[in-house]
From Swiss-Prot:
Cytoplasmic side: 50-57, 124-136, 221-240, 296-314
Name the UniProt record assigns to this protein: Olfactory receptor 5P69
Name of the gene: Or5p69
Membrane side Extracellular: residue ranges: 1-28, 79-102, 158-199, 262-274
Membrane topology classification: Multi-pass membrane protein
GO molecular function: G protein-coupled receptor activity; olfactory receptor activity
TM annotation in the entry: 29-49, 58-78, 103-123, 137-157, 200-220, 241-261, 275-295
PANTHER family with a match to the protein in the record: OLFACTORY RECEPTOR (PTHR48018)
InterPro entries cross-referenced by the UniProt entry: GPCR_Rhodpsn, GPCR_Rhodpsn_7TM, Olfact_rcpt
Family the entry assigns: Belongs to the G-protein coupled receptor 1 family.
SUPFAM superfamilies with a match to the protein in the record: Family A G protein-coupled receptor-like
A Pfam family the protein falls into: 7tm_4
Chief place where the protein resides: membrane
Disulphide linkage map: 100-192
Length: 314
């Protein structure tokens, strides 16, 4: 049953996710591609976490943050990808009201934690390059734990505002969500109640997270750039730039897609374009992050070689 009679209203008890496409051939192709991406995402991020845990050379603050980023990337992708894969296999993919709220909240939680972790990693690079003598004091084990715990608390608070908004919506008519997961915009379109307050609350909450984290990242890299330009050694400049390149690439990809989805006016792009960008944001980027951080990081590449060497000679 998709609807439940409640007094003068018909309450929606489940939703239908329309997914990415109706074409049977395209569905098979997309299923194969996204399944491969998801498997690479899980294996790549798990490998990153395990490598950092077993390699004493990687027991540094930067890699502590990176291990949590890998965990969050797996969570972000897993909040939507398995259900999306099911959508390709069934004729009509339904999701219950409660399951929709959980998916909605998890996507908001992991997306928010990623923002805070990227900001924490930018601050870590700022201290390492601009104040190297104070690095061990400012980025202590206790400080790292506080920054990570703060990131998860921030994610929980922002996700709570999204979930509370979801439960304030009244769905009494159409139940077809034109997306591959329960996102805010299509849910707002389906609601038959006044959503103005809820939209303001979620916009303020998500907007605050974005502004705060972007500000921290921008200020950190402004000081980093100034410090690098003042360096007289070409080798020192190259080393400083190389430590920041991976993180800057990840930040650009992540915030670039967030800007397209949540900041640009909805009239400037179609729903289908939004779906494609959402796939990149929630499915592709979590796969790319381990590759971005490992391919340009000599310490990680060295740790991989050492672990492979141990396996070969055991």
């Amino acid at each position: 049953m998709a609807f439940l009679q409640d007094g003068n209203h018909t309450a929606v008890t489940e939703f239908i996710l329309l997914g990415l496409t109706d074409g049977p051939i395209l569905r098979v192709i997309l299923f194969t591609i996204i399944l491969c991406i998801y498997l690479v995402t899980v294996s790549g991020n798990l490998s990153t976490i395990l490598l950092i845990r077993v390699s004493s050379q990687l027991h540094h603050p930067m890699y502590f943050f990176l291990s949590h980023l890998a965990s969050v990337d797996m969570g972000l992708s897993s909040s939507v990808t398995p259900n999306m894969l099911v959508n390709f296999l069934v004729k009509q993919n339904t999701i219950s009201y409660i399951a929709c709220s959980i998916q909605f909240g998890l996507a908001a939680f992991f997306g928010t934690v990623e923002c805070f972790l990227l900001a924490a990693m930018a601050y870590d690079r700022f201290v390492a390059i601009c104040n190297p003598l104070l690095y061990s004091t400012k980025i202590s084990t206790e400080s790292c734990i506080q920054l990570v715990v703060g990131s998860y608390i921030g994610g929980f608070l922002n996700a709570s505002s999204f979930i509370l908004s979801f439960f304030s919506f009244i769905f009494c008519g159409p139940n077809r969500i034109n997306h591959f997961y329960c996102d805010l915009a299509p849910l707002v379109e389906l609601s038959c109640s006044d959503v103005s307050v809820s939209v303001v609350v979620t916009s303020f909450s998500a907007g605050s997270v974005t502004v705060i984290t972007v500000f921290v990242i921008a200020v950190s890299y402004s000081y980093i750039l100034i410090t690098i330009l003042k360096m007289h050694s070409t080798e020192g400049r190259h080393k400083a730039f190389s430590t920041c390149t991976s993180h800057l690439t990840a930040v650009t990809l992540y915030y670039g897609t967030i800007t397209f989805i949540y900041v640009m006016p909805k009239s400037s792009y179609s729903t289908d374009q939004n779906k494609v960008v959402s796939v990149f944001y929630m499915v592709v980027i979590p796969m790319l992050n381990p590759l971005i951080y490992s391919l340009r990081n000599n310490e990680i590449k060295g740790a991989i070689k050492r672990q492979l060497g141990k396996k070969m000679f055991c």
